[in-house]
Amino acid sequence: IPPRNVSLSASISRMAAVAVLAVLCTACSVTRRLNDGQYLLQKVTIDTDGQTPKEERITAPTLEQYVRQTPNKRFLGTNFYVWAYNLANPDKDNWWNNFKRKVGEEPVLLDMSLTEKSVQNLKTYMNSRGYYASTASFEVDTTRRRHRAYVTYRTRQGQPYRIDTVSYDFRDRSLKTVIDVDTASTLIRPGDIFDITMLDKERERIAAYLN
């Protein structure tokens, strides 16, 4: 069994290596090639509606799918992949520079048109879930660190629209009789939130049942 002090030394060495990597990625600034008015998208946060009951609340991970811009992936808390990409000489096309670009990631720069589109997407999605009184907005902070942008999306669901009554209308009345027999299997009921996704699933269920 190796002495405890040897194991401790190895742990310290690993921690030191991580610290050195973080310093290198910071020292070799990942924003050094950016022009005035350009910002690396450093972080995106979604502030969800805490006033909505937890069982009805649309979670941040769900909403993230409708955000058009997300930051570069990170390694050990650093912008390592952007740093690796920036090591490549943009004026040279050879295997070594191509390797750096392949290992790294092209910097994701703040695009306000995509930010605004993201807000529209968030609002549209909340509407589809029955929250027609919902709101979505955003804030961009470019003062925290030079050439870096921190975007916060704020969503408020509001009160949902709920289903009052459910009825089925078929041109062929014989189909209505068949469906009425199977109402116990319906996916939508009075009192449920008016969710377009569930309406689509109910249509699919009926089509499968009739087949």
Put a short name on every predicted segment.
Residues 17-18, 199:
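Alpha-helical interaction segments
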Residues 1-16:
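Bacterial N-terminal signal peptides that target proteins for export
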Residues 29-211:
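Interaction-mediating elements
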Residues 24-27:
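C-terminal motif of bacterial Sec signal peptides marking the signal peptidase cleavage site
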